[in-house]
């Protein structure tokens, strides 16, 4: 049955009070649902669209330690990210695989500079390292990246990071939460809250597929709606002031023949100072 929607909806009863109701079915909300259900809490998750439909399905698809943050001296952040990379591989080996990256260099100084950075990256990974960084000759770089047209390339470096199916991992979390006893209902929108003595007691839900309304009672409500968090807060308090300052990245999708082969490329610095994967 797992995520069979009619079965999930049939478990919603106006008289029941859930231990926790999670609003938002992206990676964060689904992860919370797994932890809550695994802790023995009666858990309900509400998602207004499809699971992982928003930000969680629009990632870089990379599982990496944040090599670019080394230049900013965010060592603890990189170390933590490398630990999480290893944890993801351990917990979801069916969704996470390694990915070779090549960094082309246009001067020997840059080759040495990037090499030292990747050496530190490998050292921070320690036993969790996925492979050694290797130095590539100019001819090897062009062999591995035949479409590369950069002028003056003197060589490059190859290191290993990871990639994953973000939607696949999110759905795996949803199925795990359901197996642990959580109820997850998608295409259901929160339309308002009811409070008592300043505390939220229940939420009004509208089924996005059939239009019927429901009232959900819970001891705790979790806002896991990501960039829509402020909008949800205004349902509780119309005078709520925005707390988030959303940032936006751009991901472009090309046919595989644009960059043939199985190697990825990292451009450490573009003309406008960006890092491009």
Language-model segments: which ranges?
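Active-site substrate-recognition segment that forms the wall
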Residues: 35, 46, 94-97, 190, ...
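Extreme N-terminal leader/targeting segments of oxidoreductases
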Residues: 1-20, 35-39
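Glycine-rich Rossmann-fold phosphate-binding loop(s) that bind the pyrophosphate
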Residues: 25-26, 48
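N-terminal Rossmann-fold NAD(P) dinucleotide-binding loop
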Residues: 29
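Helical element adjacent to the flavin cofactor pocket in flavoenzyme catalytic cores
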Residues: 157-219
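Glycine-rich FAD pyrophosphate-binding loop
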Residues: 37-57
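Dinucleotide-binding Rossmann-like beta1-alpha1 core, especially the glycine-rich loop
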Residues: 61-144
